[in-house]
Curated annotation (Swiss-Prot):
Recorded superkingdom: Eukaryota
Topology in membrane: Peripheral membrane protein
Record organism: Rattus norvegicus (Rat)
Regulation of activity: The very low intrinsic ATPase activity is increased upon interaction with liposomes.
Region (G3 motif): 153-156
Residue ranges of the region described as G5 motif: 243
G4 motif, as annotated region: 219-222
Protein name: EH domain-containing protein 2
Gene from which the chain derives: Ehd2
Length: 543
């Protein structure tokens, strides 16, 4: 499905291009944008200054939604692995922000330790206070998916004012902080609970300005039949139209994102296609990371420029001696008029201005006499960055796009979308073999049930002792397991990579399916004790 396994110079050239673009962006920010931010106190009104970790970090995915919509299960489905410290259940189980990141060993890092680590992009979360940091942690685990991206799990959003107050920190502000820095925002909805609570509506409002990053997932859609699903989808679109303040329709993915069998398999084909589309979005994140950083920096630079004009205008209007406090109140009250004046005078788009009401609230706490007047040299440097320096980086980004021959995210559920007959665009290339190191004559754990599996195998009418991929797929789909899981089982079972299953390989596939249906996980590589006896001899002679 994806040509991930092609190797050569393109990967090195792509990485070099990304490093060049990223280092250039860091230099431009430090020399031309940061001085303007510091001069006009941009961090006190908007987001704090960026650090190297903000430029060098892996792409991040933010997963948000109301309680029990399947956020943690969705993450574990992507990783094909449990997250340290996580709990899954119908009640609100995730009560903190969890940064799921790659690490050599499994473990958790508490929030207070996390915000002092210069290699992590979370140092600027410190102002949210100890109450928030006690509800923030990093879960590290060795997982191939996390080598390319990091995932932010969020607390389940409840309904009612009591839960909002009891959090003890500004939940929408924290969401806004993450939204500015992540590459993708996934909003999960439960097909059985489409209500959007006041806090969830407020949380979605905090994401305003980042609609291009938002993807909506209608989860647990296998619990309803086709006609009901159509009505649920319509109700979701209507509800989103009331809380998302854009004329554009958000992309909604429909599916059941966990490793259990589908309860109502009528829409299996739809779920497969929707899952593939969502996976493509996630897989493309590393490839577009440099472009996203450039886009976010330009967005930030335009806001900084407008902020400089606003602050300098307020400074110019302040009296030098008497009546300062009254004048301050007048200026804050007339801020919408001031915005309109600045817009006309400097030919600035209305979309570049911050939220007027929020700006008025923030200005109340500041001393206008400490503001600085307009400094043309700083603004000239910013304009030069936007018009010339950024333009010079675009050819490097185009080169990176053209030379990229792979989707960046591998492992986990992404492996199952490209295995054998479960691939939409034909069979994939060779995959690495399983683990080595056990005795060839060790007992095969599938032997005790092989007679049962043989009966099913021969009822499927194999040709020349082998079952074709299409016949095997028809039988495997009957288990109602998701295609990504069946794809991984196919990868493990087709030991000789011939695109077909003999009786031993079919027995192995059946054994793995039963194990999965009982709630067990799948191995990353096939352990030697699971390799069929005849295939052990073949592998031994090849070596």
């Amino acid at each position: 499905m994806f040509s991930w396994l092609k190797k050569g110079g393109a990967r090195g050239q792509r990485s070099e291009a990304i490093r060049t673009v990223t280092s250039s962006l860091k230099e431009l920010y430090r020399t031309k944008l940061l001085p303007l931010e510091e001069h006009y106190r941009f961090g006190s009104f908007h987001s704090p200054a960026l650090e190297d970790a903000d430029f060098d970090g892996k792409p991040m995915v933010l997963v948000a939604g109301q309680y029990s919509t399947g956020k943690t299960s969705f993450i574990q489905y992507l990783l094909e692995q449990e997250v340290p410290g996580s709990r899954v259940g119908p009640e609100p189980t995730t009560d903190c922000f969890v940064a799921v990141m790659h690490g050599e060993t499994e473990g958790t890092v508490p929030g207070n330790a996390l915000v002092v680590d210069p290699e992590k992009p979370f140092r600027k979360l410190n102002p949210f206070g100890n109450t928030f940091l006690n509800r923030f942690m990093c879960a590290q685990l060795p997982n191939q998916v996390l080598e390319s991206i990091s995932i932010i799990d969020t607390p389940g959003i409840l309904s009612g004012a009591k839960q909002r107050v009891s959090r003890g920190y500004d939940f929408p502000a924290v969401l806004r902080w993450f939204a500015e820095r992540v590459d993708l925002i996934i909003l999960l909805f439960d097909a059985h609970k489409l209500e959007i609570s006041d806090e969830f509506s407020e949380a979605i409002g905090a994401l305003r300005g980042h609609e291009d990053k938002i993807r909506v997932v209608l989860n647990k859609a296998d619990m309803v039949e086709t006609q009901q699903l159509m009505r649920v989808y319509g109700a979701l679109m209507w509800a989103l139209g009331k809380v998302v303040g854009t004329p554009e329709v958000l992309r909604v993915y429909i599916g059941s994102f966990w490793s259990q069998p589908l309860l109502v398999p009528d829409n299996r084909r739809l779920f497969e296609l929707e899952e593939q589309d969502l996976f493509r979005d996630i897989q493309g994140l590393p490839r577009h990371a440099a472009l996203r950083k450039l886009n976010d920096l330009v967005k930030r630079a335009r806001l900084v420029r407008v902020h400089a004009y606003i602050i300098s205008y307020l400074k110019k209007e302040m009296p030098s001696v008497f009546g300062k406090e009254n004048k301050k109140k007048q200026l804050i009250f007339k801020l919408p008029v001031i915005f309109a004046k600045i817009q006309l005078e400097h030919h600035i788009s209305p979309g570049d201005f911050p939220d007027c009401q929020k700006m008025q609230e923030l200005l109340m706490a500041h001393d206008f006499t400490k503001f600085h007047s307009l400094k043309p040299k700083l603004l000239e440097a910013l304009d030069e960055m936007l018009t010339h320096d950024i333009a010079k980086l675009m050819p490097l980004l185009r080169q990176e796009e053209l030379e990229s021959v792979e989707a960046g995210v591998q492992g986990g559920a992404f492996e199952g979308t490209r295995m054998g007959p479960f691939v939409e665009r034909g069979p994939d290339e060779a995959i690495e073999d399983g683990e080595e190191g056990s005795e060839d004559d060790a007992e095969w754990v599938v032997t005790k049930d092989k007679s049962k599996y043989d009966e099913i195998f021969y009822n499927l009418a194999p040709a020349d002792g082998k079952l074709s991929g299409s016949k095997a797929k028809t039988w495997m789909v009957g288990t109602k397991l998701p295609n990504s899981v069946l794809g991984r089982i196919w990868k493990l079972s087709d030991v000789d990579r011939d695109g077909m299953l003999d009786d031993e390989e079919f027995a192995l596939a059946s054994h793995l399916i039963e194990a999965k249906l009982e709630g067990h996980g799948l191995p990353t590589n096939l352990p030697r004790r699971l390799v069929p006896p005849s295939k052990r001899r073949q592998k031994g002679s090849a070596e």
